[in-house]
């Protein structure tokens, strides 16, 4: 018995065509290889009231072949875009590792409620990976003390040390009776610290050759070497001790080694206890004092009594943790300047951050990876809600086409001169900036030139990307796109980024979803992708809120 013929667009043939088209789309989106991913998504799966915060699941996974900093920043709309916190805003996300699922904070700073059918529910982000090369750092550097007026100003308290020469360092053992002095410090959990200093003769240690010290053992767990110095004559080593408990010991035994390191990056003081060393590159920053962010007190400044000195060989960048409802300053840290980070509440509920809770990571990048944008005085850091990234031609960046990145006050309209400048710049720069083509003309057109092996085989895709990267480095095309982080006043070459392997979940695809490829596949655009809203997880309860057992709410805590 023969089957009845079905009309075009109906019946089993049309269903099979739709299924095959969906499978083809899923396969194209399933394995992408690029240097930078541009993701244009439509917010669905719920509503977002004005002035509220929710988590946005972009339904996209990114992977790299080596440990890197995986970043996801909101894309600049134009070269002269400002931080206009009057619309949908995505908080910058930074994760250290080899894979990440893009889940970001979404704030609605606009005056209207966001619904799935609203017009302004489209956001664009850029995802990229920053390489982490091995950078040796001296934790306790032997600084030469400045002139203090003579031998009489040397610390009066001295200690006798036992010094022994080993294969690669000098081992020092000594016992000292510290003369403790109490010093108040509001940035610490205890609010105080006990300090002491003493000196011992270097003996056979050549102070003109050694430059680092490592503490191996101490008789008291709360006592540590904070700083070390040598005198101008090269005869004495001075140690500065810190003790962070209410009762310092009367006698301290120390065992440490003195050696030659010649590190390009050194810490001004001992990183312990608020900077935890990472294996190959950088430190994890721990909160020195617990605090609570509320709607009455939405800001807090974290201070770390330490700094780094790179001798202009590296850039020091701080990447904050992803704490829902909290925005932390991120970006370059200047040399020899105390670390200060502003933490701001962006959600609706109070957030409590504990003592020694990880706040972020500090990593080092060799000088030349980040280039200061022409016309900018210096690299700066910005809160996570103000992190932006853009792709612009190198020639435009070098001639100063990317303007000063300044925050704009919410609710203030731009001046006539700013509007005219933006219109002129848009006409000049939009032609050179790759933008997605219309949906009807670009349906899955971005992969017509790509082979099936490239999409299915990760190694083949990465090899092709590396070959193209080498070709562009040799050619030196000034019209090539660069990754600009206007929030930090820096830009970087796409060739220096770590290649990404991207997979978009099948549930995020829509009939109008499409792909686009630019810069020989270095920039991949996945547009018209569906993303969903999630509720913000309940924050950690603060001691103020847990201490009260009354069911009656209070406007402020009782003092």
Swiss-Prot record:
The modification Phosphothreonine is found at residue 223. It is found in: Virion tegument; Host nucleus; Host endoplasmic reticulum. Residues 415-430 have a biased composition (Acidic residues). Residues 431-440, 543-559 have a biased composition (Low complexity). Its main location: virion. Keywords: Activator, G1/S host cell cycle checkpoint dysregulation by virus, Host endoplasmic reticulum, Host nucleus, Host-virus interaction, Modulation of host cell cycle by virus, Phosphoprotein, S-nitrosylation, Virion, Virion tegument. InterPro entries: Herpes_UL82/UL83 (IPR008649). S-nitrosylation limits ability to undermine the cGAS/STING antiviral pathway. GO terms for cellular component: host cell endoplasmic reticulum; host cell nucleus; viral tegument. The modification S-nitrosocysteine is found at residue 218. Disulfide bonds: none annotated. GO terms for biological process: DNA-templated viral transcription; symbiont-mediated perturbation of host cell cycle G1/S transition checkpoint. Pfam families: Herpes_UL82_83 (PF05784). The keyword Repeat does not apply. Residues 404-440, 530-559 are annotated as: Disordered. Stimulates viral immediate-early (IE) transcription. Plays a role in the inhibition of the host innate repsonse by targeting STING1 and thus the cGAS-STING pathway. Also counteracts host DAXX-mediated repression of viral transcription. Displaces a DAXX-binding protein, ATRX, from nuclear domain 10 sites (ND10) shortly after infection. Increases the basal level of SUMOylated DAXX in infected cells. Stimulates quiescent cells to re-enter the cell cycle, proceed through G1 and enter the S phase. Belongs to the herpesviridae pp71 family. Interacts with the host protein DAXX; this interaction takes place at ND10 and induces the reversal of DAXX-mediated repression of viral transcription. Interacts with UL35. Interacts with host TMEM173/STING1; this interaction inhibits the cGAS/STING pathway. Interacts with host RB1; this interaction mediates RB1 proteasomal degradation. This is Protein pp71. It comes from Human cytomegalovirus (strain Merlin).
